[in-house]
A protein has these predicted regions:
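Loop-to-transmembrane-helix entry motif
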Residues: 28-35, 206, 247-253, 257, ...
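Extracytoplasmic/periplasmic domains immediately adjacent to an N-terminal transmembrane anchor
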Residues: 1-196, 366, 391, 397-412
Length: 412
């Protein structure tokens, strides 16, 4: 008899689980706001973000020149600067005020200032200086200015050394100017591009943030549609905590299994980004990450009482989370307090693990720390979800019982 009852309980629980899954799926499909966060944003936002950085690096950044020397050496230096792909000299100004005006008006993004003593110092064998001013509103402009001028100064230094060395052969010139030969090889990001560096981290963050927004919006809708503003409806199918948590999470898992495949596999391929991950490794790593994000979002949704609240609470966190993940800003430079805060979010370990798997060809063994922590987060947030949903079931029952008591009193 006991086994029979247990069998009935399991059977009824399974039926309720799939009933809740189906109801949640219908709620997602019928809610345009949730569809936007679950479908439209994951489909469109990666494309938009990648299109913005599709050129990887900036080329031919316009620059102004103030040449107070006007010698053959200063003109040669400027030719070397202009010959590269990074910078384009668009204006020769008579003084700094004219150059500053161009910079303020946005016609140039940098100024190259050559002092009057430029050629005289070189002739005397005294170190001379070239000053560059850059619009620091864009770090890529600064990078282009610095790279172009550094390369030009190094090349000019070589020419000056050759002229003064008195060597008799080309080989002697090579040895005197470059005694140690080196080769600069960019690994994992051969283009030295911004998209290859930033987009993988953004794709992982989109999964977490859209889940937070979508699940939060769905929770706000459920409360607004409930007579007592409860998250859990009073229904015989919604009596068990596990069936509710697993039923809802199964809906989100099915949706994001498809969305994650699109974002992490198709989008990088469409834009020829670095992608050397093994399919099995990537799938094994993403499974706990998506689960951790789902249960994290379900736990946080308990604080959402209105549909619009999730927009005000979660949207602004995207940029800070990207910074404290240790990708766009060095992890060693992050204050310890914010580093500890970042451990609460699945995106921190998801981003670091995915970048190493996707861009560096790492295996699960190489990202074992991140992989284990994601499973720990999955377990912890699953427990917190069960706790808060159990609390909601209790509140829902209490509100219904209180309402029944009021009705009985009125009838008396």
């Amino acid at each position: 008899m006991r086994a029979y009852k247990l069998k009935d309980i399991i059977s009824q629980g399974t039926k309720d689980l799939f009933y809740i899954w189906w109801q949640e799926l219908k709620a997602v499909v019928k809610d345009q706001g949730v569809l936007i966060f679950f479908i439209l944003v994951p489909l469109g936002y990666p494309l938009l973000y990648t299109f913005i950085y599709t050129n990887e690096t900036v080329r031919e950044v316009p620059a102004a020149v103030v040449d107070n020397n006007r010698s053959s050496l200063s003109r040669e230096y400027l030719r070397l600067v202009d010959a590269g792909a990074d910078l384009e000299i668009v204006s020769h100004c008579s003084d700094m005020e004219e150059a500053k005006t161009l910079l303020k008006n946005g016609k140039v993004y940098g100024i190259i200032y050559i002092p009057e003593s430029f050629s005289r110092d070189i002739t005397k064998g005294v170190q001379t200086h070239v000053t560059i001013y850059c619009d620091m509103s864009g770090m890529l402009y600064y990078k282009a200015m610095l790279t172009a001028n550094t390369n030009a100064s190094l090349m000019m230094n070589k020419q000056i050394k050759i002229e003064r060395s008195g060597n008799t052969t080309i080989r002697q010139d090579e040895v005197s100017t470059s005694p140690i030969a080196y080769e600069d090889i960019s690994i994992f990001n051969p283009q030295n591009g911004f998209a290859s560096f930033l987009i993988p981290a953004v794709l992982i963050l989109i999964i977490q943030q859209t889940l937070l927004l979508g699940v939060g919006l769905s929770a706000g809708t459920a409360r607004e549609n409930n007579r007592f503003r409860d998250l859990i409806p009073m229904s015989r199918h919604y009596h068990g905590t596990l069936r509710i948590v697993l039923g809802k999470s199964l809906t989100y898992l099915m949706i994001y299994a498809v969305m994650a495949t699109y974002m992490l596999c198709l989008v990088p391929k469409m834009f020829s980004l670095v992608q050397i991950a093994q399919a099995g490794t990537l799938a094994a790593f993403m499974f706990p990450y998506i689960l951790a994000c789902i249960f994290f979002a379900m736990t946080c949704s308990i604080f959402i009482h209105h549909r619009e609240a999730c927009m005000m609470i979660y949207v602004f966190t995207s940029v800070p989370l990207l910074f404290i993940s240790g990708i766009s800003w060095p992890g060693t430079a992050i204050p310890k307090f914010w580093e500890v805060i970042s451990w609460l979010f699945p995106s921190t370990f998801g981003i670091n693990g995915f970048v190493r798997i996707n861009n560096m060809g790492a295996t699960l063994t190489d990202v074992l720390t991140e992989y284990r922590i994601l499973w720990i987060q999955t377990g912890v947030y699953f427990l917190t979800t069960c706790i808060v949903y159990r609390r909601q079931i209790t509140l829902s029952r209490r509100h219904v019982y209180e309402r029944l008591k009021e009705i009985k009193k009125r009838r008396r």
